[in-house]
Design a protein with these regions (language model features):
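Acidic, Ser/Thr/Gly/Pro-rich low-complexity segments and short DxT(G/T)-type signature motifs
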Residues: 1-11, 75-100
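Substrate-binding cleft of secreted/luminal carbohydrate-active enzymes
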Residues: 130-136, 366-433
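Aromatic-lined carbohydrate-recognition surfaces of secreted/lumenal glycan-active proteins
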Residues: 134-135, 268-271, 301-327, 366-376
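Substrate-binding cleft of extracellular glycoside hydrolase catalytic domains
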Residues: 168-303, 310-313
Length: 433
């Protein structure tokens, strides 16, 4: 028995081109040899059919704008336990009317020319190629990118960093004012990206720093939590606002160092705001910036955006990270250039592609990126299923010395990715100078 479908029956305004349909049944499935011949759609093509546990995944190609389609899954196209034939199912859906060509306009007014060139390039290859990326091992380094080079012979296109130790910089162990590692990467032809695990005091005048919401004490895992309120963060006169203004002032100075060298930055702050609250009963918000809800979060995002604009920071390409069901957290098209999705522990390429298709349909006109990933399906299987990410970036493994056995993306995963002609390595990038 069919339990649910994605898209749902009667769904409208889906994107043209490719569509991944996922049907969830009430028992484990198998496919008969003639499965594909029993699944039809007039005016388009059923290109791939696969099953995994209770899910049947169907890749449809050749969808045109402004049309209504009916997918017919005939009786016996999928089999349940003991070979019992699943009954006939039909899923109706329609595609959106054709829109004008997307405009590669950054949300930052008068952007740095190099930032605009990067964004133009992302638009020009979107849907045809995907940029590879690697995350720094905690601090200012390209350790993981070097491991990718050792394993595959190629550097990833983007080196990502994290300003999580902003509160401590400059120090003898971390100094974001020393941009040599970023500048060297840029000078070698690569792109730069950065996130910000925004650590704040655990309480007013506190000396412990964290981004985990709580009562200001250690949690059951032994990690500090903070009472820092996102609602107060944008309100003058609060201690939270004083921290925010000081941190943004400090961050603006570090961003300006890159800007002064004409280095654009793919900027991904305030990520994963909704946590998994929309995914599971009893789900949690992971970071303080999402703890007070969507309205407080959006005010904080726009506050940061306007703060940097007033400081003359114009080298940023703004990436907002969705949790797929959190559209109320979206800051708005005027404040976002790319929509990212962080996916972990999902080895089914079609399931990843289904998330991509859903995000692309929800935030039309914005490139969609796999902004973080770990232990996911190979890039080739995701691509074949229709996931045309703008870029991808596996998370780092602390102090990894090689990719064999890497917890997020091992040697085989990276070799698969970097062997594909649609995956852009650093050596494939044009000059943006």
């Amino acid at each position: 028995r069919l339990l649910e479908s994605s898209p749902v029956n009667g769904e409208k305004n889906l994107s043209a081109g490719n569509l991944t349909v996922v049907l969830t049944y009430d028992q484990r499935l198998t496919l008969p040899a003639d499965a594909r011949s029993k699944i039809t759609i007039a005016g388009a093509t059923v290109s791939e059919v696969s099953v995994y546990l209770t899910k049947a995944t169907i890749l449809i190609t050749g969808l045109e704008n402004g049309k209504t389609y009916e997918l017919v899954v005939s009786q016996g196209a999928v089999l349940g336990l003991a070979g019992v034939e699943a009954p006939r199912t039909t899923i109706s859906f329609s595609t959106a009317e054709a829109a004008g060509p997307p405009i590669a306009k950054l949300c930052t007014p008068n952007p740095l020319p190099q930032a605009q060139k990067v964004y133009d390039y992302l638009f020009s290859i979107y849907g045809e190629k995907v940029l590879s990326g690697a995350m720094a091992n905690v601090n200012w380094n390209i350790a993981e990118a070097e491991l990718v080079k050792q394993a595959t012979g190629k550097y990833p296109a983007i080196a990502f960093f994290d300003y999580l130790h902003l509160f401590a910089s400059p120090a003898d162990w971390i100094d974001y004012g020393d941009i040599k590692v970023a500048k060297d990467w840029w000078d070698a032809g690569g792109l730069i990206g950065a996130g910000w695990h925004w650590n704040v005091p655990n309480v007013k005048n506190g000396v412990e720093y964290t981004c985990t919401p709580g009562d200001g004490n250690k949690n059951s895992d032994g990690n500090w939590t903070t009472t820092f309120s996102a609602s107060n963060a944008t309100v003058d006169g609060t201690w939270e606002n004083e921290v925010v203004k000081a941190d943004l002032e400090k961050m603006a100075g570090y961003l300006k160092l890159l800007q002064d060298k004409n280095i654009p930055l793919i900027w991904r702050p305030l990520h994963e705001a909704a946590g998994n609250t929309y995914e599971y009963t009893g789900g949690k918000v992971w970071f303080w910036w999402g703890y007070d809800g969507a309205d407080a979060y959006k005010k904080l995002w726009i506050y940061m955006f306007n703060f940097f604009k007033e400081k003359g920071i114009n080298n940023l390409i703004w990436v907002w990270t969705t949790q797929t069901k959190d559209a109320d957290f979206y800051p708005g098209d005027d404040y976002v250039d790319i929509v990212g999705r962080d996916i972990y522990n999902q080895k089914d390429g079609a399931a990843n592609a289904a998330q991509y298709s859903s995000i692309k349909a929800t935030y039309s006109g914005k490139p969609v990126a796999l902004s973080e990933c770990g232990s996911v399906a190979t890039v080739s299987s995701q691509w074949s299923a229709g996931a045309r990410w703008s870029f991808f970036m596996p998370w780092y493994q602390y102090n990894a010395t090689g990719l064999d056995g890497h917890e997020h993306a091992d040697t085989a995963w990276w070799k698969d990715a970097m062997s594909k002609d649609y995956v852009v390595a650093r050596e494939d990038l044009p000059s943006f100078k």
